[in-house]
Amino acid sequence: MHNLLSRANALLAFTLWVMAAVTAACFLSTVFLDYTVPTKLTVNDVKVRNVVDYATDEQQADLATLNFNLKVDFSKIFNWNVKQLFVYLVAEYKSKVNEVNQVVLWDRIVERADRVVMDEIGVKSKYYFLDDGTNLLNHKNVTFVLRYNVIPNSGYLRLVQSSDQVVVPFPTTYTTTRRS
């Protein structure tokens, strides 16, 4: 009859085929789901400071500091095919030099076992909001939007943008205090 190695090979090949079919079924069962959730985002206490930037030709840069409040419930997103979320806050604006400027200000990894309902109040930006030049002062249209990557157990990585955006006009004068 068949020896032990050929039987083990057949068993392993069948097991891998079944696992591939289950993985494909897992992906297909969640591919058409809507992963957008309502968010409530407010941006407060925006200050712009002019700093020296030796990395640019102008040697001037605008540094913005701000606080924000975020309320979002991600529990609807976590189905059995979602492993974790990578959530981040982006500021978008136009300047004379660049048509699109996007700056990530804050991020967080949300896992299934973590708290999936975020109610953050008075959060400071985690990363510097630095513009190469003086384009932030008196800017009328800086848009803040929450985005998140849905990291699945199987399937493709989704980029989801919150439907709610906040447009904030920036101050008309520089702040002169040392602390924000």
From Swiss-Prot:
For this protein, the record's InterPro entries field holds:
SPC3
Which stretches of this protein does UniProt put in the Cytoplasmic compartment?
1-12
Q: How does it sit in the membrane?
A: Single-pass type II membrane protein
Any idea where this protein resides? Endoplasmic reticulum membrane
- Superkingdom assignment: Eukaryota
Functionally, this protein is described as follows: Essential component of the signal peptidase complex (SPC) which catalyzes the cleavage of N-terminal signal sequences from nascent proteins as they are translocated into the lumen of the endoplasmic reticulum. Essential for the SPC catalytic activity, possibly by stabilizing and positioning the active center of the complex close to the lumenal surface.
Family label: Belongs to the SPCS3 family.
Q: What is this protein called?
A: Signal peptidase complex subunit 3
